[in-house]
Curated annotation (Swiss-Prot):
CDD domains cross-referenced by the UniProt entry: DRE_TIM_HOA
Residue ranges of domain Pyruvate carboxyltransferase in the record: 9-261
The organism of origin for this protein: Pseudomonas sp. (strain CF600)
Keywords attached to this entry: Aromatic hydrocarbons catabolism, Lyase, Manganese, Metal-binding, Plasmid
InterPro entries: 2-IPM_HCS-like (IPR050073), 4OH_2_O-val_aldolase (IPR017629), Aldolase_TIM (IPR013785), DmpG_comm (IPR012425), DRE_TIM_HOA (IPR035685), PYR_CT (IPR000891)
UniProt-recorded name of the protein: 4-hydroxy-2-oxovalerate aldolase
Record-annotated active site: 21 (proton acceptor)
Annotated Mn(2+) binding sites: 18, 200, 202
Gene behind the chain: dmpG
């Protein structure tokens, strides 16, 4: 495949969805309006809006949001004129009923997300989204956990259901550039030429931007990123950094770098109650290949049981826990506590 640097990249911002994890889903409506205005001014292509765990993610298991998904979507819809509103749906958390409501509130793009081995559970939701006329994306989470060829098979399933774009989501921020190359090439080998591919990076190994750049060089059409990297774990690929690199490379991204830089520092970074950065705990996520949104839950469990967050995260990695198993974090903490007591006996 010949890389075409003049091809228009689709810039997908996830500050108002993945970024919600970084502040335990506590954005105010004024926050989302201000962020949406800045992103729309900068001319990103889509703005993803939802609880961090997607439509109807607000729950005891994942953490309650300050507002409902529909309140957030409606708030953003009133502020934008260029970008499309995207949303995320995990089958089993959100339903087709929730998707219909999100569409009526203004969402026009949906990413139907499953664990990387469970594409088959997305069929109903992808078909329903296509029937609504939505831009319908298949989103394979924790993509580091299976070989490239197996991941491509799962993407092919989502394509067969009607998805017109397939995303590789490095939810654990655990992949290297070669991992990205292998998976992008595997996608391209089996998907239809007209099916787009996307990259969703996390920055736990400080490779979020590098991995996104490599993905584009391998033919990726859509790139996820967030202002100031606002997202689970060490965050996503920082949008303003990715755009700065793309600008230096002469790529056609269509966004305004300085507007993004101002929004990152003046609007988003002040909202962080815990710095979104690579540190001992978030590096542990990437090193152990752990779902990035486990971070804040593990920190709470560590404080409650007087354990180290890193120990909990590494054990979660050993057990190959995946998104949706947040309830197991306390179980792991209790097992570690019992082991510590036994060692002291």
């Amino acid at each position: 495949m010949t890389f075409n640097p003049s091809k228009k990249l689709y810039i997908s911002d996830v500050t108002l969805r993945d970024g919600s994890h970084a502040i335990r889903h506590q954005y105010t409506l004024d926050d989302v309006r201000a962020i949406a205005r800045a992103l729309d001014k900068a001319k990103v292509d889509s703005i993803e809006v939802a609880h961090g765990d997607g439509l109807q993610g607000s729950s005891f298991n994942y953490g309650f949001g300050r507002h409902t998904d529909l309140e957030y979507i409606e708030a953003v819809a009133g502020e934008i004129s260029h970008a499309q509103i995207a949303t995320l749906l995990l089958p089993g958390i959100g339903s087709v009923h929730d998707l219909k409501n999100a569409y009526q509130a203004g969402a026009r793009v949906v990413r139907v997300a499953t664990h990387c081995t469970e594409a088959d559970v997305s069929k109903q939701h992808i078909e329903y989204a296509r029937n609504l006329g939505m831009d319908t994306v298949g989103f394979l989470m924790m993509s580091h956990m299976i070989p490239a060829e197996k991941l491509a098979e799962q993407g092919k399933l989502m394509e067969s259901y009607g998805a017109t774009c397939i995303y590789m989501a490095d939810s654990g921020g655990a992949m290297s550039m070669n991992d990205i190359r292998d998976r992008m090439r595997a996608f391209k080998a089996v998907l239809k030429p007209e099916t787009q591919v996307g990259m969703h990076a996390h920055h736990n190994l400080s490779l979020g931007v590098a991995n996104s750049i490599v993905a584009v060089e391998e033919g990726c059409d859509r790139v996820d990123a967030s202002l100031a990297g606002m997202g689970a774990g060490a965050g996503n690929a920082p949008l303003e950094v990715f755009i700065a690199v793309a600008e230096r490379l002469g790529w056609n991204h269509g966004t305004d770098l300085y507007t993004l830089m101002d929004a990152a520092d003046d609007i988003v970074r002040p909202l962080q109650d815990r710095p979104v950065r690579v540190d001992r705990e978030t590096l542990g996520l990437g090193y152990a290949g752990v779902y990035s949104s486990f971070l804040r839950h593990a920190e709470i469990a560590a404080a409650k049981y007087n354990l180290k967050t890193l120990d909990i995260l590494v054990e979660l990695g050993h057990r190959r826990m995946v998104g949706g198993q947040e309830d197991m974090i306390v179980d792991v903490a209790l097992d570690l506590l019992a082991a510590h007591k036994e060692n002291r006996a």
